[in-house]
Regions:
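General beta-strand structural signal in soluble alpha/beta enzymes
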Residues: 146, 178-181, 202-205, 221-224, ...
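Conserved small-residue-rich beta-alpha loop and adjacent elements
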Residues: 85-89, 93-166, 170, 217-221
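Active-site/ligand-binding-proximal alpha/beta "capping" segment
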Residues: 191-200, 215
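Conserved acidic residues
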Residues: 117, 199, 261
Length: 289
């Protein structure tokens, strides 16, 4: 293993011990601070993002790939608001999930939620994942090692600076969130081979990325593969609300892996109501097969 990645793993290990000392309120304060730094450094983030977008266009990346890269003033504001929402969530830790007893000897058992530990997150061209993933890991008391795609490295670096500044501002270990800044794919392999040092890998991206990680990881993974997201229009649901939900699910950001690809419609809906919903999609250039 390279000295560079070995250092990241050591930082993550120490950070996991420091993370265990934090209260739910401490973790909420971190997230609120991150939100504030995102807004305060918005222009720097946008400038870095423009570098990534320009480079992507020079490399003739596909339009959907370029669209995934783009951040705007509004998107950064929304990202900051999303972090605040995560900060306000109920603490997921130390919750009693199940309880039972042994009737023979009277022993009491409880299943309680605890952090996983160190989570490696590998993702492609959506820079907002840097903030989403880090925030969710912080809220749940986990240290994260983030490895984004090379196509959005400038944006990710700037976003990570916001995270580190937020942690340092609170006089906390800045490596509660770690970031693989080197874009060499060899470091992805090192992350996948870090058995015993990384507790789980969560990939977020296209089929080829997920398959590569599945085939090569010695660390347990939490993954999807094919995508093919479904939306179900069930019996008794009004066509107006169905149209709104289906429109959003498919057309809000059609280039992302979470966009609806399959629509299942209950047989009770009339042909006229179905046409009402599908015509809306067709009018926006969506092909119905």
């Amino acid at each position: 293993m390279s000295d560079y990645f070995d250092q990241i793993l050591k930082q993550a290990k120490q950070a996991s011990l420091d993370m265990a000392k934090l209260t739910a309120n401490d973790r909420s304060k971190i997230l609120m601070n991150i939100s504030g730094f995102l807004v305060a450094r918005k222009q720097e983030i946008l400038q870095a993002n423009q570098l990534d977008v320009d480079r992507a266009k020079q490399k003739n990346l596909s339009a959907p790939m370029v669209n995934r890269l783009i951040l705007t003033d509004t998107k950064i504001d929304q990202l900051a608001q999303d972090v605040e929402k995560i900060a306000q969530m109920a603490d997921p830790l130390n919750q009693e999930l199940e309880k039972w007893s042994n009737t023979t000897n009277g022993l009491q058992f409880s299943k309680v939620s605890v952090p996983i530990g160190v989570i490696g997150i590998i993702y492609e061209s959506r820079p907002n994942v840097t903030i989403d993933a880090a925030s969710l890991c912080l809220r749940s008391g986990n240290v994260s090692i983030l490895r984004g795609g090379s196509e959005c490295i400038e944006t990710n670096r700037k976003l990570y600076e916001c995270i580190q500044e937020a942690l340092k501002d609170l006089q906390l270990n800045p490596y509660l969130v770690c970031f693989v800044e080197q874009t060499d794919r060899a470091y992805v392999q090192e992350l996948l081979q870090a058995e015993g040092k990384v507790d789980v890998i969560i990939p977020r991206g296209g089929k080829s990325l997920i398959q590569t990680i599945t085939d090569n990881s010695r660390v347990p993974t939490i993954k999807h593969l094919e995508g093919i997201c479904h939306t179900i229009w069930d019996e008794g649901y009004p066509k107006e609300q169905a149209q709104s939900i289906i429109h959003n699910a498919k057309l809000r950001r059609p280039e992302i892996c979470g966009a609806t690809e399959t629509l299942l419609i209950h047989s009770s809906h009339s042909a006229e109501d179905i046409a009402y919903v599908l015509d809306d999609l067709k009018s926006q250039g969506c092909e119905i097969i």
